[in-house]
Amino acid sequence: MKNILRKMMLVLVICSICGSLYFSNFGDPMVWLFAGHWFDPCHLCWRGRILMYPLLPVVIYALFAKDDHLSFLTAFSSFCGMFLAGYHYLIQQKTLQNVFACAPGNDCSVVDWHIGFVTIPFLELVAFVMIFALSITILIQLKRKK
């Protein structure tokens, strides 16, 4: 069961990284077909990447070494990522004020891409929540095993 959870976590991390790289290299899939518009990640997006990208080697190692204790690391990283992505999403929805200085022309509150309420930080939030839930599930199973 834990191996399936680790594989699910690996798929989530790979999809998140590929999605992140796709948006920064190609941008909106519909606009890119015609104009070649890509998105420059804001500083909050970069911090989200800093929390997401290192999860790939950690999850791969945990999968092959069958090391359940690395779920503490994935849980902590995804927990921090949940707060960061949630904060970023609330800034975009104009619910919170951005207390960080943004680069000119690369404001964190600007919604570059959306489908209804789903924006790039919302996708990041969903990924971190799912990784956190999988990590906690593995940790609960580890505790029951003892």
Give the positions of each predicted feature:
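Secretory/periplasmic and organellar redox-cofactor proteins
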Residues: 1-44, 51-146
